Design a protein with these regions (language model features):
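Beta-strand-enriched cores of mature, soluble protein domains
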Residues: 1-150
Length: 150
């Protein structure tokens, strides 16, 4: 198997499912991009720049629990290369952000399958996100995915 490791910044929306107090849906997208981190005496500077290429699209279903945890499943399509399906490892968590009007959270997903170049994929994806009161999501993924050789 061949290992690929990459990071993407997704932006999109999350919101409640009509008729359910605990279920939500999320949709977000990430363009092809470069991420830059510079460490220096003046602190940490970061930047994300969109570049030419295709985009990734995430679609997921979330069920939240009273203790601030949640489970999630869904798919991420990586342009025309294919997609992966995922489910939560254990439970994710959400908490109030120190920035008023935002919630922050994190979750780890296991890759349960895929298609196209991702057929037979395995691996883990971490998601570290912030959600505004209006449902706008900024979500940073780090993926370690194993692809079949050939």
């Amino acid at each position: 198997m061949r290992e690929i490791v990459f990071a993407l910044e997704f932006r999109g929306r999350a919101g409640p499912v009509a008729g359910s107090p605990t279920k939500r849906r999320a949709t977000s997208a990430a363009p092809s991009q470069t991420m830059t981190t510079v460490l220096g005496a003046d602190g940490v500077r970061t930047r994300v720049d969109e570049i030419a290429g295709e985009r990734a699209v995430l679609e997921s279903r979330v069920e939240r629990f009273e203790d601030g945890t949640f489970v999630e499943d869904g798919t991420i399509t990586y342009g025309r290369a294919g997609s992966v399906s995922f489910v939560t490892v254990g439970r994710g968590m959400v908490a109030p952000s120190p920035v008023a009007g935002r919630t922050l959270g994190a979750v780890m997903w296991t890759v349960t399958g895929g298609d196209g170049l991702f057929a037979g994929a395995q691996g883990l994806i971490t998601s570290n996100f912030a959600v505004s009161a209006g449902g706008e999501v900024v979500d940073h993924h780090v993926a370690r995915i194993y692809l079949r050789d050939g």
